[in-house]
């Protein structure tokens, strides 16, 4: 699952620090979530989906996180 999130982040051409910043997270907090040490909140999942929609209009939260 977490490699999918990293893959989508790479498709956005963003670093962990950049994507974390868009979510209101520090680089370390985002890194912990991407590596599965803590969970993304529902709000963060929605924000990531919204960032991906211009590139992948049909993407779902399930596609990204499950």
Predicted regions, residues:
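Residue-level recognition of specific faces of alpha-helices
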Residues: 4, 29-32, 63
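Short amphipathic recognition helices of helix-turn-helix/homeodomain-type DNA-binding modules
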Residues: 60-66
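Acidic-residue sensor for enzyme active/binding pockets
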Residues: 16-17, 34, 44
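Short basic helix-loop element that most often maps to the first helix and adjoining turn
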Residues: 3-22
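Recognition helix of helix-turn-helix/homeodomain-like DNA-binding domains
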Residues: 25-40
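DNA major-groove recognition helix of helix-turn-helix/homeodomain DNA-binding modules
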Residues: 43-59
């Amino acid at each position: 699952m977490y490699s999918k999130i990293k893959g989508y982040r790479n498709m956005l051409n963003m670093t962990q620090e950049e994507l974390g910043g868009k979510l209101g997270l520090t680089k370390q907090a985002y890194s912990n979530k991407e590596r599965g040490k803590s969970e993304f909140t529902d709000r963060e999942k929605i924000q990531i989906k919204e960032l991906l929609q211009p590139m992948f209009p049909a993407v779902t939260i399930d596609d990204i996180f499950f």
